[in-house]
């Protein structure tokens, strides 16, 4: 709605959200202007709006964000190479987002409480198993996406997440990192992967 504050949010070196700029919605639109040294993951947050966050890649160029608070599937990011790629990744995983949403809608109240009876414990375990299956499918899709989109910032973000959550071996992450252009290695995510590699590679070699 017009007059709504829109916040541009990035993260500091510890991953803590950091508001970077604020504008107001005017005539149903908002605009941020500025320059950035390198691409980074960011999001715009709409004040007092349920599900009012939209993730995108902050980089130089014109990025267009279409936001629909009533139908999140209509949210769209476009305009730069990385954001087009990010949107294609999101589009490919809409079915998974729908599955997660359906589980929450069907079991929201139940998931708020501690299971007490045997029947409740079985149901809770079933929900956990369902989430685990979805997570495994998501991890597989992320790895497939990385394999098809080597040397891109979006793939780097996915590798960073997979590597930090122990879903990717250090040797595989190193293979990916070594093939990156220097400008990608210099991003916050590139430095983060390098730092984690320095810790994890010796541990992996020691186990071998």
Model regions and ranges:
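A conserved position within tetratricopeptide repeats
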Residues: 111-114, 146, 163, 180-185
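A non-transmembrane, solvent-exposed segment enriched in polar/low-complexity residues
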Residues: 1-140
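N-proximal helix/coil linker or "cap" segments that precede and/or mark the start of modular domains
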Residues: 172-208
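Amphipathic alpha-helical coiled-coil segments
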Residues: 131-149, 168-172
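Amphipathic alpha-helical repeat scaffolds of TPR domains
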Residues: 151-162
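Short coil turns that delineate tetratricopeptide repeat
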Residues: 149-153, 185-188
């Amino acid at each position: 709605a017009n007059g709504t504050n829109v916040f541009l949010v990035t993260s500091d070196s510890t991953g803590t959200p950091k508001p970077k700029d604020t504008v107001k919605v005017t005539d149903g639109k908002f605009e941020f202007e500025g320059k950035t040294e390198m691409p980074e993951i960011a999001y715009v947050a709409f004040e007092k709006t349920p599900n009012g966050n939209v993730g995108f890649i902050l980089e130089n160029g014109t990025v267009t964000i279409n936001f629909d608070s009533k139908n999140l599937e209509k949210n769209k990011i476009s305009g730069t190479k990385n954001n087009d790629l990010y949107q294609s990744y999101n589009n490919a995983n809409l079915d998974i987002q729908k599955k997660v949403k359906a589980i929450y809608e069907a079991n929201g109240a139940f998931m708020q409480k501690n299971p007490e009876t045997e029947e409740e414990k079985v149901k809770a375990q079933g929900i956990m198993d369902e989430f685990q299956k979805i997570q495994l499918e998501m991890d597989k899709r992320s790895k497939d996406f990385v394999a098809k989109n080597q040397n891109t910032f979006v793939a780097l973000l996915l590798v960073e997440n997979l590597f930090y959550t122990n879903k990717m071996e250090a040797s595989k992450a190193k293979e990916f990192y070594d093939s990156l252009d220097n400008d990608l290695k210099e991003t916050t995510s590139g430095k983060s992967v390098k730092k984690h590699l320095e810790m994890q590679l010796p541990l992996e070699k020691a186990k071998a």
